[in-house]
Every structure is written in C-alpha cells, then in structure tokens.
Amino acid sequence: PSVQDAAAQLTADVKKDLRDSWKVLGSDKKGDGMALMTTLFNDHQETIAYFKRMGDVSQGMANSKLRGHSITLMYALQNFIDQLDSTDDLICVVEKFAVNHITRKISGAEFGKINGPMKKVLASKNFGDKYANAWAKLVGVVQAAL
C-alpha cells in the first residue's frame, strides 16, 4: 500500500489505543526501548547484522550505542504519536525516519519484524492484542515508506 493508504488505517479507535498504550510505554523510554531492541535481537537474531556499528549488543544496558539507539527509537515513536492528528505531518516524520532505514537497506518486511517484540513488550505491560494490532498498523505506515 501507499503511505497514504497505510496512514488511512489509523482510525480514531486505533489512535486511541496507540495513545493509551504510549502513556505507559513512553514513561520509561530507556527501559522499554531496550526491551524492544533486545527482544528483537533474541527473536530475530539475523537482525543483529544491521547493527554492527553498535558492537556487542548482548551487553544490553552496558552498551552505550545500543542504549542510545533504544532511546532514539522511543523518541521517534513519541514523534509519531504526537503527529497522529495530522496525517500529512505523520507522513512527513515517517518518511524522514524511513530514510535512515533505507540507507541501511532495511526493507519493509525486515522492519516489520519489530511487531513481535512490540507485542511482547506491550503484553508485559498488560496491553493485549488490540494494542499490538494498533502498533502494527503504525508500523505499517513506516513499512509503506520503505
């Protein structure tokens, strides 16, 4: 789908679920960002190859480059949440975010591997499938930009 078509999937209910779950996820950006990244690496070990510049990602919090990426990821998500009321602005920030992934040759399919870890992190915060599905729709907007 086009980025516009993917963004059109973000209904009022989906946006509410994103915002409600972000209130919890966004309250510990470093911890939850690290949880997302380490779960991604554990569940999809092949993705570690995209992060070679970070060195040994198995060091977790002790790896400052991984910590930095995790925090940056969470602020990107914050930016997406902040733009939910303006599809045009959301698409602008998503396309800017996508550039960083395109230069690293990360496809939409590869990027979509974050959905499983996101579902697990959400579940650890007592957010069920409805919320994971909302995040998958937002990830779908990024995938469409890749």
Swiss-Prot record:
It comes from the Eukaryota. InterPro entries: Globin (IPR000971), Globin-like_OT (IPR050532), Globin-like_sf (IPR009050), Globin/Proto (IPR012292), Mb-like_M (IPR044399). Keywords: Heme, Iron, Metal-binding, Oxygen transport, Transport. Residues 9-146 form the Globin domain. One of its GO terms (molecular function) is oxygen carrier activity. Pfam families: Globin (PF00042). Heme b binds at H101. SUPFAM superfamilies: Globin-like. CDD domains: Mb-like. Homodimer. Belongs to the globin family. This is Globin-2B. It comes from Anadara trapezia (Sydney cockle).
